């Protein structure tokens, strides 16, 4: 809860745990010296979230709602387990431009992914992989990447020869293989590897792409899906760039 008036002194102690105004000012990121304690009103101490469990179906809308609920409070998210978007059609994380938080820090100690694209089938090319981060708050997003930030791999292209059709492999991570009416399906991708396209003699559907890479075309020249992007939108403040698969800014 932010510092409130009219009893600013007791309010800042409750918010920061600091009895001395100078120490409370540091906790509340008040940099002016000298300062009036009235400048504490509306400010909050940094909130720290620890994410220690893997989530392979993460929904960005949940995170947006939680951040909005904090108002102007800055939030630090320590990501200590792998996170994957629930669909290649949505990024793993999205930070809309109207988020009220003073700043948001991502300390990434694991791998975070856009989801891999679905493999194509018959005359259809592979589907694109999902993006990882959509940032529309500029440098209010701070990224300390000690793990991997990955766009999802594209799905492999399908093929059809005569009445025979087969599915391409899913893009890494967790992209679904293309499903054929003849049950000649592409393999689903795992967290660690893209799926293989169905092989039928000299004909084949395309393999799914690894993270940050497009899927492969089939022998019938149905193209693979485009790679998902790692970071899209406006440039964040990079504390540490680290390992990235896919385009970023």
Curated annotation (Swiss-Prot):
The N-terminus is involved in binding to the fiber protein p37. The C-terminus contains glycine-rich motifs (GRM) and mediates the host specificity. The glycine-rich motifs assemble into a 3-layered PG(II) sandwich domain. Interacts with host OmpC receptor; this interaction allows the reversible adsorption of the phage on the host membrane. This is Receptor-recognizing protein gp38. Keywords: Host-virus interaction, Receptor, Viral attachment to host cell, Viral tail protein, Virion, Virus entry into host cell. A motif (GRM 9) lies at residues 213-218. A motif (GRM 4) lies at residues 164-172. The keyword Transferase does not apply. Belongs to the S16-like receptor-recognizing protein gp38 family. A motif (GRM 2) lies at residues 124-131. GO terms for cellular component: virus tail. InterPro entries: Gp38_N, Receptor-recog_Gp38. A motif (GRM 5) lies at residues 175-181. A motif (GRM 8) lies at residues 204-210. A motif (GRM 7) lies at residues 192-199. It comes from Salmonella phage S16. A motif (GRM 6) lies at residues 184-190. It is found in: Virion. A motif (GRM 3) lies at residues 151-161. Receptor binding protein (RBP) that is at the tip of the long tail fibers and serves as the phage recognition site for the attachment host receptor OmpC. The record marks 7, 20, 36 as: Interaction with the fiber protein p37.
């Amino acid at each position: 809860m932010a510092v409130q008036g009219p009893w600013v002194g007791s309010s800042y102690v409750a918010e920061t745990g600091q009895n001395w105004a100078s120490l409370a000012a540091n906790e509340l990121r008040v940099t002016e010296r000298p300062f009036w304690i009235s400048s504490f009103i509306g400010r909050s101490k940094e909130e720290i979230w620890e994410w220690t469990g893997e989530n392979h179906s993460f929904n960005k809308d949940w995170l947006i709602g939680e951040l909005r609920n904090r108002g102007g409070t800055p939030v630090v998210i320590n990501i200590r387990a792998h996170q994957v978007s629930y669909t290649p059609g949505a990024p793993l994380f999205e930070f809309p431009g109207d988020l009220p938080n003073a700043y948001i820090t991502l300390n990434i100690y694991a791998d975070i992914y856009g989801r891999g694209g679905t493999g194509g089938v018959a005359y259809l090319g592979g589907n694109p992989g999902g993006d990882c981060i959509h940032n529309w708050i500029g440098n209010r997003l701070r990224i300390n990447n000690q793990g991997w930030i990955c766009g999802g791999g594209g799905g492999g292209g399908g093929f059809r020869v005569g009445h025979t059709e087969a599915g391409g492999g899913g893009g890494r991570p967790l992209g679904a293989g293309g499903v054929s009416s003849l049950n000649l399906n592409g393999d689903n991708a795992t967290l660690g590897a893209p799926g293989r396209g169905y092989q039928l003699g000299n004909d084949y559907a395309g393999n799914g792409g690894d993270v940050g890479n497009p899927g492969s075309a089939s022998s019938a020249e149905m193209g693979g899906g485009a790679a998902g992007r790692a970071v899209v939108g406006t440039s964040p403040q990079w504390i540490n760039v680290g390992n990235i698969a896919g385009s970023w800014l």
